[in-house]
Structure formats: C-alpha cells, structure tokens
Regions:
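Beta-strand-turn-beta hairpins that frame and shape the catalytic cleft
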Residues: 1-3, 110-117, 186-192
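Core catalytic region of metal-dependent phosphoesterases/phosphodiesterases
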Residues: 3-100
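Active-site environment of divalent metal-dependent phosphoester hydrolases
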Residues: 9-14, 38-41, 65-70, 111, ...
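His/acidic metal-ligating clusters that form di-metal
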Residues: 26-29, 95-168
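Charged helix-capping and loop-helix junction motifs
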Residues: 44-46, 133-139, 175-177
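Short active-site oxyanion
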Residues: 56-59, 151-152, 221
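Short aromatic-enriched loop/helix-cap "lid" or pocket-rim segments at secondary-structure transitions
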Residues: 71-75, 129-130, 165-168, 233-235
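Acidic, His/Gly-rich catalytic cores of divalent-metal-dependent hydrolytic chemistry
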Residues: 168-253
Length: 253
C-alpha cells in the first residue's frame, strides 16, 4: 500500500502523526510529493525524517518551496520581501549543506507502478501550476496518462484534497472526498487525486492530510489526522517567522 504525503512545510509534528497513521494502516511504500520546507518551524527535523525514508526506498519530489530555499536569495528593491522569500531566507539558516544537496537532486515527478506523482502539474512541473480547476486537472491528467503505463496521477501543491475521475459518458468529474471512506476505482479508468497538505491545510480544517492507495485492489482513501497543531503554531511564533504563518496553521486556512 502506497502512502502519499505532500506539502510537509517543515511541520514535524504533523509529519510524525501522518507517518504513524500510515504505518498503522498498513503502508509499505511512501511517496513524498514536495514542499518539504517553508512556513513551518522544523525544516531540519523534517528533512532528516524524509532523508531516512528515502534511504529506505521512498520516492521524494522537489516542490517550489524546496526550490526557493536552494535558490539564490531574491534581491531587495525596497523593504518589502514576499512572505515566501522570508520563509526561504529563514529556512536557509536552519538547514545543512547535506540537506541542500539532498533537495537539489530531487526530481519534479516520478512513476510508481501505474501512478505518476508530481508536486504541481504534470503538463509543466517547473511552472508550479495549481491543479484546482477542471481545466487544469484535464491538462495535468492528459499529460500524465500520455506516459507509457500511467493510469492515474497524484498531485500536491494546492493544500486541499480532491478527486477527478474521467467518465466514459460525462468526461472529467470532480469530487470532494470524505475522509476515511474508500474510493473503489474501476480498472482502466484515468483519474487524478490531489492529496492535500500534511503540514499546512487550507480548507478550514487544521488536521493533517494524506492519502493511501492500494494498487492491487484499486482502492484510494483520503485521511485527516489529528495532531497538536496549536503547539506547531506556537513553535512558529517562537521561531521569529511571520505570525501569519502561525495563525494560518491555527485556523487551517
């Protein structure tokens, strides 16, 4: 069974809770869909955990926040710095050269069985498109399933859980999944799932998100996992990063 986790955002408490839940649920493989760092208070701890998973065979991708952290700092033209760059600057001071080397060698997409995994959109992974509309989902799914052996694609980046299914009669349809309820998926159908965010949900529910997929039975389950998100928010405040990062975690938005 494949556990799919995305947008960890340096939130070690959320990651540990999701990994414990996945292991208890029978996960035997792991795919980490990028944005390991950014916003959260524990980038080094999260990277250490992910690197250990990678050493055991997990697939790990690079996201836009990972890319920004290892890029050259953005030059100031005034006193205003985008919040993403504020986060990247802070993160650079918290991680090691070994962490940076690990991030820079990560791919943007990978194939796991009949699944393509990608942080943003399969049609242009480096442009960081949000797969948050039927149109964007269609472009992503089309690009993914043009690859030999790919039937479905798993995506991160939007911090929400969604399921898109291509019907023979109605074309691509969108569903909002119910946590813990399995989707039994007919063979030969193409579909797309956005797996949500482990470390920074944005749908009004502060619980961590991830998904489990059993390729043998073609059953997909989206999960929400309780963890101490208020302690994680307090750690952000203590880190000296913008308070907005903490309040967003507190509200799940």
């Amino acid at each position: 069974m494949l556990a799919l986790l995305s947008d960890l955002h340096a939130n070690a408490r959320a990651l540990d809770a999701c990994l414990a839940h996945a292991r208890a649920s029978g996960a035997t493989q792991y795919a980490i869909l990028g944005d390991l760092v950014g916003y959260g208070p524990e980038p080094a701890a999260v990277l250490d955990t992910v690197m250990a998973l990678a050493a055991e065979g997990a697939v790990v991708l690079r996201g836009n926040h990972d890319e920004a952290t290892c890029a050259a700092p953005v030059a100031r033209i005034n006193d205003d710095i985008p919040t993403d760059e504020v986060s990247a600057q802070w993160t650079r001071g918290q991680i090691t050269a070994q962490h940076r080397r690990f991030i820079t060698q990560l791919p943007l997409s990978a194939q796991v069985g009949s699944s393509l995994v990608v942080h943003a959109s399969a049609d242009a992974p480096m442009e960081w498109h949000y797969v948050d509309t039927l149109h964007r989902a269609e472009l992503c799914l089309k690009a993914a399933t043009e690859r030999p052996g790919v039937q479905q694609v798993f995506v991160g980046h939007i911090h929400r859980q969604r399921f898109y299914y291509r019907s023979s009669r109605s074309g691509l349809m969108e569903f909002e999944p119910v946590p813990g309820v399995a989707f039994p998926i007919p063979a030969q159908r193409h579909w797309l799932a956005t797996v949500g965010s482990v470390g920074q949900p944005r749908d009004g529910d502060p619980r961590a998100m991830y998904a489990l997929y059993d390729e043998a039975t073609r059953r997909l389950v989206f999960h929400r996992v309780e963890y101490d998100h208020l302690a994680a928010a307090a750690a952000i405040r203590a880190s000296g990063q913008p308070v907005f990062f903490a309040t967003r975690l507190e509200s799940g938005r």
